Every structure is written in C-alpha cells, then in structure tokens.
Amino acid sequence: MEGGFFTADVLSVQRLRAGARDELLKWSKGTVYPASGTSAKSEVASLAIEEARKKIESLLPGGNIWFTSGPDEAANWAIKGISAAQRRKGSKIIAAPDSHLSILNAVRSIQGEEGVIASTASAINIETGVLLDIQRWEQNISENHPHARRIIDARGAIGRIDLAPLTRSSDVIILDSETCGGPVGVGALWVRKGVRIEPLIHGSGQENGRRSGTVPISLVCAFAAACIEAELKRTTNTKLWNKNHSQLEDAIRSIHGIIHGETEARAPGITCASIPGYFAEIRIQHLEERGIIVSPASGCSSTAGKPSHVLTSMGVDTDTAMRSLRFSLPEDTTSKDLKRLIEALQN
C-alpha cells in the first residue's frame, strides 16, 4: 500500500522491484555516457548493457535479446521485420482475435493475401490470464503452415510462467519490462539464432545494426534486474497469488460476478471479472474514492468507454464486457489489503 492507496492491478502500473530501482538510480547519477561512444566511460556503459542482455538471455536460451522502447515497438518490429524478411515467400500473417492491439494493428497495417509467413499468439492473455495451449498452437501451424515463423507475445510472462516452452516453440518473443517490476519505456525482442528479421528503425546502427537509437543504459539494466528477481521469486509468488486470487474470485462469485476464462488454464495472479451493477468506469471511480486502484479489463485508458476486444472475441456480450475489471494483486498483498478490497466490492 502506498500513500493510503492499495493498487489491486499491478499490471497497469509501474511498480519497481528493489533491484530495478537500484539499477535505475545507479545509472542515472551524474553524466551518463552513451554506450556507442569511444571514451572509456562509454566502454563501461557498453559492458553494462551487454551484461544486462546476458542476464535476460540466460532466462531465454537459444536466442538473442535486442532492446526496444517497449513491448509495442517490439510487437511492431516482430510483425514488420518478419514480413520484410519473408516477403518473397508471402505476405499474410495470422493473428488471434484476442491478441494485444499492438499486434492486431501492426498486422492490419501490412496484411497481404498471399502465403502465410507468420503466426502470432499470446503466451498469456494479459486481460484474462488465460494461457496459450502451446502444443495445440504449434501443431496447428505445423500441419497448416509449416514454413511460417512463430511469434509469441510474452507480456506478463516473466515471473509468472515457465519460459522454457516459449523458447522451444517460437522464432521471436515479445518482452516487456513493467509487468515484471521493471521501468516503463523499455522492452525487448528475443530472436532465435539463425532467424532473419529486418530492422524496424533505421539510423546509426545500434544493437548490432538491428535497432538504431541510443540504448538507455539505466532502463535496460533495471529491466534485467527486474527479470532476474521476478524469476527467482516465481515459485513463492505463485503460491501467494493462487491463495489470494482464489479468495478474491470466491468473493466476486458471491455477488454474482463472472470470472472470465475460469474454466481454462490461467496464469497466476490475474483475474478478469464482470460484476453486476455499475459499468467498469463508474466502479473504478467508486473504488478509488475508497483508496483502491483497479483497471478496466484492458488495463488501458486508450480503450476507456469501449468493451474489451478480448472479451468480445471470447463471446462475451457488450453489456457484460463493459462491467469487467482486471485484478492483478501485488505479491506483498496482506490479508488486510485483501479484506479491504473484497469489502469494497461487496458493498
């Protein structure tokens, strides 16, 4: 709890882990030298960035990490970079209807009709927590589009699920920082070794010519620290999330709420629910007046006033979707915090 407020949806905020905060402060003091410079100070920065890269690559073996300004850029790079690299083989990319809008809009911007060159899927549906059936997805691609590249959006996956199946089943993985306790403004693209992908941003050739633009040392070092800490705490946090979210969902059912995706395998620590009564925007305001911060199902203000495209793609009617909220409880949620949230929802 901060300043009397309890944030019940950490996926929608920047909540820095201790290690990430330390790295952010460490590399924000005094004069910061660009890693691409030629001075000894720049060499220190370059080594720090490479160390951050290696830390994240240690969690995702078999590929290389290239830093971006965030997951939306990484998604656009994955879609457009693969499309450019595969243009002689076709122009069509398959995206699940419940994909993040950055995926859907990137696909729409370049979509062709000839030859499937890639298929995308989300490791975790970031709104409902529903997990991708990787084996089924992989089998479908192998049977119908055996030469298509496989792109997995792994937003929210670090520190919540085992990453090994993702690296075994994908050519490209989209990663974000803030959902694992790192800073906003940084993300990454994991590219399997040997997979060709064209640059999205052209310029001075940073990131070994793959992504131009000065690499923000403080952000990437904080991102890497958050990844390592989140993974180290994954087993412990999973137990806490399962316990707390089970109590929360029981309470929501007691007031005739609907838990979306409850019959499917879900990632720990994510609950999407539609609660009878007020539309989500009104309920969010009422909860904030009681010192509790939650988000609409999409977790994004840019879609406020609209039903979640994820929920409608699941067959949820517009009225129910407009009453949906997302909860992703902090790992340090206390019994007092949980009781306060449940009482606010029930009353």
What role is predicted for each listed range?
Residues 1-347:
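Pyridoxal 5′-phosphate
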